[in-house]
UniProtKB/Swiss-Prot annotation:
Keywords: Ribonucleoprotein, Ribosomal protein, RNA-binding, rRNA-binding
Gene: rplN
NCBIfam families: rplN_bact
Species lineage: Bacteria, Bacillati, Bacillota, Clostridia, Lachnospirales
Protein name (record): Large ribosomal subunit protein uL14
SUPFAM superfamilies according to UniProt: Ribosomal protein L14 (SSF50193)
Amino acid sequence: MIQSESRLKVADNSGAKELLCIRVMGGSTRRYANIGDIIVASVKDATPGGVVKKGDVVKAVVVRTVKGARRKDGSYIRFDENAAVIIKDDKNPKGTRIFGPVARELREKQFMKIVSLAPEVL
């Protein structure tokens, strides 16, 4: 469950290392983001020579949360960290690699490129 001011790790090679959530997309009263939701975030830490720089405002999709997500069969999927992938306006990732596992819920929300690049889909 991600909200405004939450910090997330970046799970791609776009150059950013840490994000600060500014806004959850989807209406003015929307408070929390779960797996597969889009957020607006600020880059708080970045590697030199990356595509994105520290201070850039980017859109990202949440791929892992500590809170997890409930599935239709009643099971839950949870992760050890909150992580996101920086995306372009066409919902494709800015980076060319995805690090760590991603949840199956991303496939249902049409983030096919992220799912295909991920090393593991849980």
